[in-house]
Amino acid sequence: MKKRIDISTYLYIVIIVIIYFMGTTMGLAQEVITASNFDSKIAKDIVVVEFWAEWNKANEFAELNKLKDSSVYRVDIMHCSKLQADYKISAVPTVVVFDNGVEKERFNANIMFQLEADKKTIQTSIDTIILNKFK
């Protein structure tokens, strides 16, 4: 005799799968930008860009998506050597905060290719830019 599984069981399974995948991928959902769209992406408002490389994925800035009041993007220096040269990126990860296309602050990796700044430090930089707009 076949067991009958009602629609609510299927719905329950689908919801669990969706919640699982949202929880495991949302933290990694920064847009990777290239040389062709870089200038247009950083031109407006406050933008935080992480310059990174696939070979140093273990040290990427994992909290990039948790920053508030800014757009966040990533640049893979292995595919954007011109941007690496233009912005003088010598170690990855390097996080650069832009305001209307102008570099305001930079946070570099140390000799172990680990970012020395934490989320709070970078968020403070963003908050300072916002506060200065009201002075």
Where are these regions (language model features)?
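Structural micro-motif
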Residues: 87-98
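Extracytoplasmic/secreted cell-surface and envelope-processing proteins
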Residues: 58-60, 83-84, 105-107
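N-terminal leader/targeting and pre-domain segments
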Residues: 25-44, 121-135
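Bacterial N-terminal signal peptides that target proteins for export
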Residues: 2-14
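Non-catalytic, surface beta->alpha helical segment in thiol-disulfide oxidoreductase systems
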Residues: 97-135
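Local sequence-structure signature of Cys/Sec-based thiol-disulfide redox active-site neighborhoods
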Residues: 32-68
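Thiol-based oxidoreductase modules, predominantly thioredoxin-like and allied folds used
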Residues: 51-55, 68-83
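Bacterial N-terminal signal peptides
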Residues: 12-24
